[in-house]
Amino acid sequence: MPPKAHAWVGPSSIARVLACPPSARFSEQFPDTESDFAAEGTEAHELCEYLVRKALGEKVRNPKKKLKFYNAEMQECAEGYAAYIMELYETAKQNCTTTEIMLEQRVDVSEYIPECFGTADCIIVADGTMTISDYKHGMGIKVEATDNPQLKTYALGTLAMFDFLYDINTVRLIIYQPRLENVDEW
């Protein structure tokens, strides 16, 4: 997992800021607290990252022992995500030998939005196509990829990082939300 850092405004809060711009500065006065639901989601992301890195052949440490919220459902969700990401990656590699995959990648968008950065769950870049996938562990609200401000913000930053290396003409945005059986692509 990347170091815990928070932007003044990040991709995960961009929808709120677009709807109410003053909320960006207003929210600074409140402590940055994490609910149990958010902590569970963070741990699910750690497990997802571990399983994808393991599938890629990287030497990684299994995080299960330190996960407070780990259970069979989290394992099943993370395994499904890892299989899905590996399928996307293998398909991209068939079309481009220089395909890049990045997990928990810091994306800087400050060229367009001051002090804006965030961490994208998975970015796959191949000639012609860039795919950004976001894992959602929550089951309270179904998240859609279509016109998703968070994913579009990651796309903006990722294009700035890779457009000079790859001739990107297609951007795929994907939400993977297994507990609601939701895999949505735009």
Question: What do these predicted ranges mean?
Answer:
Residues T97-W186:
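Mg2+/Mn2+-dependent nuclease catalytic core
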Residues Q29-T33, Y70, M139:
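Residue-level detector of alpha-helix boundaries and kinks
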Residues M1-P3:
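Glycine- and charge-rich intrinsically disordered segments
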Residues H6-L56:
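Nuclease catalytic cores
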Residues V17-L18, P22-R25, L51, I85-L88, ...:
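Broad hydrophobic/π-residue packing in well-ordered secondary structure
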Residues E34-S35, A39, E43-Q105, S110:
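A non-catalytic, helix-rich entry segment at domain boundaries
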